Amino acid sequence: MGNEILKAPEGPPSDVERIKKESDYLRGTLKESMLEPLSAGISDDDNRLMKHHGSYLQDDRDLRNERQKQKLEPAYQFMLRVRMPGGVATPEQWLVMDELARKYGNGTLKLTTRETFQMHGILKWNMKKTIQSIHSAMLDTIAACGDVNRNVMCTSNPYQSEIHREVYEWSKKLSDDLLPRTRAYHEIWLDEEKVAGTPDADEVEPMYGPLYLPRKFKIGIAVPPSNDIDVFSQDLGFIAIVEDDKLIGFNVAIGGGMGMTHGDKATYPQLAKVIGFCKPEQLYDVAEKTITIQRDYGNRSVRKNARFKYTVDRLGLETVKNELENRLGWSLAEAKPYHFEHNGDRYGWVKGVKGRWHFTMFVEGGRVTDYDDYKLMTGLREIAKVHTGDIRLTANQNLIIANVTSQKKKKISELIEQFGLTDGKHYTALRRSSIACVALPTCGLAMAEAERYLPKLIDKIDEIVEENGLKNEEITIRMTGCPNGCARHALGEIGFIGKAPGKYNMYLGAAFDGSRLSKMYRENIGEEEILKELRNILPRYAKERNEGERFGDFVIRAGIVKETTDGTNFHD
């Protein structure tokens, strides 16, 4: 196909494009806004820029109406997200994050579905101190949000530790090498002096340019048989290919993404498609050139159609592949065979190479805090004080106390026991396979509860599960407070998307290994109807399933929902 069809959609640039253009490479008036003493918030333009620095301005929506009555501004606060490729933290970094959450945040840490930390409830006056403390722990928040490449994920379960280590190094290299080059972050938060003069755009941002990307860009690397990072949900996914215990390269998959807009069929979740294979040393080149295609041809006019998945679907998979190979100057090899078995975590102790041990722990909703009857945050703090390995955050909002020496295993096991930290074995497998986004009260986009509500809903679903002998049956269940899809709802065998307070669209039929999207089953229903539907479907699954048949496969075979064969027919 000729180059004549390679163009971005026409239309005036969105307001965010104007903000980026006028921002002097993400500086804007952020420095001044953060010093403004009369408001705990910042201007809308600066908030759009703030994302690229790893933060969103939010307010406590539980307090919104009361504050309006009192004629007060909203209870503004900031969410801060750390850039932590592959979800790997040292015990020392864990202790710093723990302390900052208690000192400046709301006393909790959120483990995200992209393997990093979020802190909520930080006041404007404490932001700079918090970011500087994170920096002193050899971490940062650069590009954790915004129209750039986000936190690079990789499979965290350390069964193949040597392979995992290599894959982690590649994810770290990608994350570091694809960072924006502007010094705005260092000047605003770390008091670096601005260099005088006006350098050329290609000096400041050789890859991104002055407008950065049309929308966020997500990369993840999976190591089969685990698809815990949901590689097909990424804008750019890499699937590690291992032969004779050696990493020989990666299959390349492009064009995934979960977000959509209620009522707009031109928006939809989509799965990345495998287009070929590259060697490890070609990985960065493939990533960089793919990003530049999105930079040049993505939609800068309509933000809800600006993700790379829409660029791929609009131009055509083959066209994008050809353009990628054009820019690379070489062709991708043919994709290699691979096999995924699941996209969940494997819990409990497992022994890796070199006599090291790893404990995968269930953290419901990814929320690390101290409850009245469960001192989770304190327990993890005490473990971090004695642990000499690392701590890995998983894409399912759990964590792994990893690389534990045989000498330390006894002490760490005692602390796990003392604080009741759990591998989730006494819960149903469905609860262990659940994830939820933050939603209310802090997320400004949420239309309904998610993290605060899903555990209570599962309490009731568990009764149906246990009555039907399904306690040990892994069924992935995911809930998001809005259609943006942070908890990857469209890849849950049972998925819920918030529509209004207490109301959800219910989806069924995603694949257990993350290779098929779900289909809407019921629209705008509340708890009573959700439970009524599951009281009908789960007993049927228990009685009628074939041996080894997964719930997501069963509901399609039984005709309960149609199969979604591609994101473009998600709404059919």
UniProtKB/Swiss-Prot annotation:
Keywords associated with the record: 4Fe-4S, Amino-acid biosynthesis, Cysteine biosynthesis, Heme, Iron, Iron-sulfur, Metal-binding, NADP, Oxidoreductase
Binding, [4Fe-4S] cluster: C437, C443, C482, C486
Name used for this protein in its record: Sulfite reductase [NADPH] hemoprotein beta-component
Organism encoding this protein: Bacillus licheniformis (strain ATCC 14580 / DSM 13 / JCM 2505 / CCUG 7422 / NBRC 12200 / NCIMB 9375 / NCTC 10341 / NRRL NRS-1264 / Gibson 46)
Cofactor binding note from Swiss-Prot or TrEMBL: Binds 1 siroheme per subunit.
Cellular component per GO, a single term: sulfite reductase complex (NADPH)
Metabolic or biological pathway: Sulfur metabolism; hydrogen sulfide biosynthesis; hydrogen sulfide from sulfite (NADPH route): step 1/1
Transmembrane segments: none
